[in-house]
Amino acid sequence: MMAAVAQFSFVIPSVETRDLAGDLRELFAELDATLPHDQRVYSGECHPALDVLETQSAVEVIVDVAGVQAEAIRILFRGDTLVIAGEKAPGPGTAQPTFHLVEREFGRFARAVRLTGAFDVSRASASLRAGELAIVLPRIAERRGRPHIIPLTNGERRS
């Protein structure tokens, strides 16, 4: 039996795009400053696959990052967007190899997933195991939009 697939919106408005671009610049600048010279990638792009799954208590994002060290990954949640950025460095190789087949990707990567709902990001967690990055965002009760009675007093204003 196959699991249900929920629809998520991936269109990000232009103001949020500018914020996201700034966040990505900061994340990559931090990686440049902290990664050892031999783990830094100067060109190339990597496109790791990801899954987004929802349970009753959380949303989980699983990203395939085989060969990427934990110190080469940054995770950020802003507004309703989860951003995963990092660098996958090529393994040590011989000088001037002759390739017969090239399928693996190396370089910087950034994935952004827009999520709906309310999350307790202070309890969010991420773990890297066997080449899979698992990010768990616990849900909290949505309070926005619920009616809330504001008491009315007769007399002077309160500050």
In which residue ranges do the predicted regions lie?
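An anionic, turn-rich surface loop/hairpin at beta-sheet edges
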Residues: 92-112
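Structural motif
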Residues: 58, 81-83, 132-134
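N-terminal leader/pre-domain low-complexity segments
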Residues: 1-62, 85, 90-94, 157-159
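Short, well-ordered beta-strand segments enriched in hydrophobic/aromatic residues
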Residues: 59-65, 134-137
